[in-house]
Amino acid sequence: MIKNLFLALFTTTILGFFLKNTVENIFIYNNSIKPILIGMLFTAIILFISTKIDKSHRSLNTLTRVEAVKIGLVQAVAIMPGISRSGLTYFITLQSGIKKEEAFKFSFLLAIPTILGAAFVETITNFKDITTTTAL
């Protein structure tokens, strides 16, 4: 399971670095609420579908490398506003046939390094702005 967590995290990190500036330019700096609403609607649909999935029978130990990469890719897509990272990773893990409890576990274990890493990158990227603001 640890190897799959690292593989999913690595995939998220690589794709996230490529998507970050594009997503910020398209969705965040255009001052429109529409992308957020679309993302939230998409998340609601995915979560609704998740409640209907009943093919979960496998344990996390049976998760393949390809499935771990898919989970990492989906998590990177959640960089878009309004899209739930945990909802998407839970959904794709369920789609892989993993038991619901273990899908939640994997999703939240994956969240810890992802969120800490994103916070670190944002802090380093915006450090100049942070120090300038606090100096006022």
Which residues fall in each region the model found?
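Multi-pass membrane proteins that catalyze or facilitate reactions on polyprenyl-/lipid-phosphate substrates
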Residues: 1-136
